[in-house]
Amino acid sequence: MSEVKVSLKGRVIALLLGCVFLVTISEFVVRAVYPSWSEFYAGRYMVTESVPGHGIVAVGKAGFDGYFAQNNGDFRAHIKINDFGLRNDDPAVAANQRVWILGDSMAFGWGVEADEMYSSVIGELINTPTYNVASPGTNVCGYQALAARMPKDISPAAVVVGLIIENDLSNYDCPATAKAAESSDRASTGSTFNLGTIKQMLSKHSALYNFFAVSLKRVSIMREALIWVGVIKKSHAYRNPLEGKDMEQIAKATANELDRLRNMFDANTKFVVQIAPARFEIANDDPAYIAARLRLREALTERGIPYVDPIDRFKADGFEATHFIHDGHWSAKGHRIAAEETAAWLRSNLPQ
């Protein structure tokens, strides 16, 4: 009986070792024949930085020059980060008296080439140099941090803040948030080992995982199966993080922090908020997001903060024409629409 048990145990061990060997060999083979596997991980070109008085903010990895792609085939874009951690060819000191574009992933140009992102298109349209001061994963408090870390001996000719309705509206208190971050050692007190972190880890380290992710996501029946079991999310699935919250207070708090951002610059510096309307309003006239956008506009007006709202242009051109198929970000067409609307405001308000 013991011999049978040993035999079964040995077979199981042999099977496991064989699987490990097969996966290891496959990993090395895929790395050799599929060198672009690492392009799907955005963390390759992003780092975090502590900004005194503003806490932690995400910025680009200085000197990065490579490609970033979506494994669903939406895009493959060249990303070049300068020595200051921003997506510009010129150094930060060259930003003096340019039009600064502050924002998160949309302003950063997620998925589009550098000459297609709206900061670049604005510069072409108004024949005035611009400078991209944007970083994925930030919010209004992060925009304050990005502005604060710019060289102290330079200043903008104007500031455009890209504000995303879906992500950037919150009951902010940026000074309190920064103070809490600086007084904390930011140590994790609980486990974050879940499906999301596993996928992120595999995206970062495994060529084999990325190969299968690309292959499966591009086969319709397999993609639907993965959505059904919860491994991947449905494209443009409805989400509203503001649901059930006090929209009046959220709009007011957001406008207050945008005003704080405006006051970080000289009083004569032209300042405008470019509103990025929600996907679900553009595609389906979602009433919750319509209400959120209109309440934000009211709060900005109460604060005397100018804004550009390109909702009519986006609705005229349509959701599919202005966004990536699976990703929630603007395509090159969406960037151009936003740039044209904002450029019109700048032409009317900047000295000629």
Question: Language model features by range: what are they?
Answer:
Residues 92, 108-187, 191:
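Conserved SGNH/GDSL esterase-like catalytic core that processes O-acyl groups on lipids
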Residues 164-297, 310-319:
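Serine-dependent acyl-ester chemistry module
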Residues 33-128, 239-241, 314-318, 325, ...:
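Membrane/wall-proximal cationic-aromatic binding patches
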Residues 281-352:
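Catalytic His-Asp segment of secreted/periplasmic serine-dependent ester chemistry enzymes
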Residues 1-8:
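N-terminal Lys/Arg-rich, disordered targeting/topogenic segments
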Residues 140, 144, 251, 255, ...:
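Short, amphipathic alpha-helical "lid/cap" segments that border enzyme active or binding sites
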Residues 13-28:
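Hydrophobic membrane-insertion alpha-helices, especially the h-region
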